[in-house]
Amino acid sequence: LETRVQILTLLVEGNSMRSVSRICDVSINTVAKMLVDAGEACLALHDEKVRGVKSERIQCDEIWSFCYAKAKNVKAAKAAPDHAGDVWTWTALDADTKLMISYFVGDRSGESARVLLYDLAGRVDGRVQITTDGFASYLRAVEGAFGADADYAMLEKVYGADKLTSSPERKYSPAECVGSRKIAI
């Protein structure tokens, strides 16, 4: 039990699976199995407990990552698995408590937006205010999942022009956000 607690503690603290394997003197397969088991337990606990949430304001967003290789590099990658490429984590967060009410991992499509919003609708109780970024797929998803039971707005960020955008110093830096625009739906 002590070793299991140590493995999970190190993973939660951000250690890599290989470093956890070395520190705890266990195989990397043991660490991977513990990670999968813990993930499945957390999924079941979240699904059971995060129901009937009374939330006033919910913020939905999506964040990009990749599995194995970026989508543009998958064809050139050696032995890329079927699920290789871009991955989007969709989130619905209570703006006040920061409770992660709903989440979904998928692509950046209208179907993924729909899955997130329908799951969210099944977890909240009462009328809510939903805010998203300007991704158009949210429009149909919010209307389909909530109908008239939600106040909905998009919050679009406005970015300034940057003369150094193409320079090596700016290649991986985000553009400067100079404001935002609210769009009530």
Per-range role (PLM):
Residues L1-I185:
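Residue-level recognition of single "structural anchor" positions
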